Amino acid sequence: MIKPRTPPGVLELLPREQIAFQRMLDVIRRNYERFGFLPVETPVFELSDVLLTKSGGETERQVYFVQSTGTLANAAESGATRLPELALRFDLTVPLARYVAEYEHVLAFPFRRYQMQRVYRGERAQRGRFREFYQCDIDVIGKQTLSIRYDAEVLAVIHAVFSELGIGDFQVQLNNRKVLRGFLESQGVRDGDLQLAVLREVDKLDKRGVLDVRDTLIGQGFGIPAAQVENILTFVATRSTSHADALVRLDALIEDSGPEAHEMLRQGVAELREVLTLVNVLGVPEHAYRLNFSIARGLDYYTGTVYETSLINHPQIGSICSGGRYENLANHYTQSKLPGVGISIGLTRLFWQLRDAGVMDGIAESSVQAMVVLMDEATLDDALDIARCLRIGGINTEVQMEAKKVSKQFQYASRAGIRFVVLAGDDERARGVVAVKDLTREQQFEIPREELASTLQVELEQAKVM
């Protein structure tokens, strides 16, 4: 007999956990749609040459390739060594680039899409690292140009999503890569590749600490003078304390740089100022975001605004949502310039971390809201009719199909996390009522049959408010 077990690197949930996970998906989807984003799904596998056009190195080593047994056998016989034709997607960005390039002649721009699907990476199996996981992405794609105003709207989406998720106080850290690169120019770091390397080091400050990053930047690999490194580290330590303070700090940055301020720095500051102004108009409270000059995002394709979101009371979880602005999404697939801005929520890892931190305790019980007890075999038709009426009234209802002891049926409802248990014995039927036991409040009451669904609906709505 084979021992049942799941492969490493996957998150498999019990029903109550799956309900909580599904509700998080529903909240994210609902908020994406409220902001006018359209749903897109792409195949779980793509053509290898298309998927891997922009990748290499570590990414390619983590890709799962798809090969039929027949093709595999033929390749072995012929001695062919080329990559398999198909590969599983490792993120949602590359499939989006292919999708927009393929359908750009029929899409309406700016194209606003959301995508919530599983992706696959051959990560080394370890705690908190997954080989199969959900990503929940939004992107706004322009043709030739895209207004910086969309960057503010994306921040408003982040605020809406995490406010409704209700998993704790959060804060969006906001920056602009042009500000970082313009400041590096002012410190004599002018080579583009060196700038990107410095930004990658800055992005590791929280993990490695200031001393380690300082030593790296001064060391042989970078060779930046110590005085300039100190200026860089002082600069990236900048944090705003309020909306007004953020604007003051941006003004001070330009003033301190003087008339010789690099044009890229000026442009980045202007973009941040507009984003901050519009975020305020969009109703995002100032405690929900901060200017943070250390936020760089490790991915090199970000060119402007960048975001990182974290839970204030659970800093150990790290970033729960990140993204930014990029200049040309699909340059490997089309000659059209397709700038965009977007974010991604890695929901599988976030859910695992929240569960590990105890944040998910008690969030969800069951998607079944009521259970009808089967008193005896003679009352089956009546029990089914009660359940039918409840379902018509919008109540998720389960019926016990076997006339077990009533106490056993109650035990089942309690264990399954069902709130309402409905009973209709001979006496209740004669009086046209049903008995309802609220297992959450430990109360029992009678309701006229015709009012059953509406009464339970009111009780459930009140529970949402509480």
Swiss-Prot record:
Its BP terms in the Gene Ontology are: histidyl-tRNA aminoacylation
Query: Which PROSITE patterns has this protein been placed in?
Result: AA_TRNA_LIGASE_II (PS50862)
Q: Does the keyword Transmembrane helix apply?
A: no
What Gene Ontology terms describe where this protein resides (cellular component)? Answer: cytoplasm
Q: Where in the cell is it found?
A: Cytoplasm
Key words of the record: Aminoacyl-tRNA synthetase, ATP-binding, Cytoplasm, Ligase, Nucleotide-binding, Protein biosynthesis
Q: Does the keyword Lipid metabolism apply?
A: no
Q: What is its main location?
A: cytoplasm
Subunit structure comment from the entry: Homodimer.
What family, per the record? Belongs to the class-II aminoacyl-tRNA synthetase family.
What name has this protein been given in UniProt?
Histidine--tRNA ligase
* Native source species: Xylella fastidiosa (strain 9a5c)
Q: Which gene does this sequence derive from?
A: hisS
